[in-house]
Amino acid sequence: MMKLMLFSIIVILFSLIGSIHGADVPGNYPLDSSDDTYLCAPLGENPSCIQICRKHGVKYGYCYAFQCWCEYLEDKNVKS
């Protein structure tokens, strides 16, 4: 009985930790002067996307779905 209780507590704690750290980071796809998204490859951390995101006023971005995604980029800052 004690092992079951301990196991249940551990499962609950890991569930709570996962929900805290699993939160989505807000952001946007930046747009160029033609209202197009910036295409990119390879996926993941991408120096080109980081540079584009810095141009749009945020510190970090990456290549997601072959388009640059900038973390914490607000709607008002999408177009450069």
From Swiss-Prot:
Signal peptide residues on this chain, from the entry's feature table: 1-22
Main location: secreted
SUPFAM superfamilies: Scorpion toxin-like (SSF57095)
Phylogenetic lineage: Eukaryota, Metazoa, Ecdysozoa, Arthropoda, Chelicerata
Record flagged with keyword Secreted: yes
Encoding gene (name): aaF1CA26
PROSITE patterns named among the record's database cross-references: LCN_CSAB
Pfam hit, one: Toxin_3
Protein name per Swiss-Prot or TrEMBL: Toxin-like peptide AaF1CA26
Domain comment quoted from the record: Has the structural arrangement of an alpha-helix connected to antiparallel beta-sheets by disulfide bonds (CS-alpha/beta).
